[in-house]
Amino acid sequence: MAPSRKFFVGGNWKMNGRKNNLGELINTLNAAKVPADTEVVCAPPTAYIDFARQKLDPKIAVAAQNCYKVANGAFTGEISPGMIKDLGATWVVLGHSERRHVFGESDELIGQKVAHALAEGLGVIACIGEKLDEREAGITEKVVFEQTKVIADNVKDWSKVVLAYEPVWAIGTGKTATPQQAQEVHEKLRGWLKSNVSDAVAQSARIIYGGSVTGATCKELASQPDVDGFLVGGASLKPEFVDIINAKQ
């Protein structure tokens, strides 16, 4: 990892937790040592964004797990970037594979969400990744490049964007991409950014890995030159998340 790219660890709590056990998790995180050269962001369920922001130490930022593409309107059940900011969160996760595959979100919709969230001043953790059949068909690059292009077309300022590579076959399955597999895709993504955005963005943009990251797998993954951090699911609800935060130490 280039020294200019600050290590980034996001915890995606998904649809888990209640105030009592999330409060315990927050106490654990507040007591944890967060290295000065590591940025930590937690994404609680929407209902608990306010609770998490009030309880979490300021050293840990808060993200929403999703948002809609406009500021207000007749969109029952949705939340806008302006509302997310109003609750004290500063980031949003967009394009997560569960949004793509469980809820049928298209590349186009995700791109529109990215554009609106950035315009409203949120940082964006933009997720991309191939399914198992796509990897086995040898089209990993094609898939992730197409997804990245739609995101890139909607980004003016890359300093507010973290790209999260999440091979769908490794999310919640216990299967982790090997450090070499992760590095290979991250390196190719950086090459795509160099060719299609700019060399400066390719050097500075953080590309993080998600997909069954645990305390046991994080150190070797973090040692890869193009892996700039993690987006962590299940393990972010456990004390081992502290080990992942310290993966570079």
From Swiss-Prot:
Pathway note: Carbohydrate degradation; glycolysis; D-glyceraldehyde 3-phosphate from glycerone phosphate: step 1/1; Carbohydrate biosynthesis; gluconeogenesis
The protein's Enzyme Commission number: 5.3.1.1, 4.2.3.3
Cellular component GO terms held in the UniProt record: cytosol
Residue numbers of Phosphothreonine PTMs: T173, T214
Residue(s) carrying Phosphoserine: S80, S106, S159, S198, S212, S223
The protein's assembly and partners: Homodimer.
Official protein name in the record: Triosephosphate isomerase
Species, as recorded: Bos taurus (Bovine)
Gene this protein is translated from: TPI1
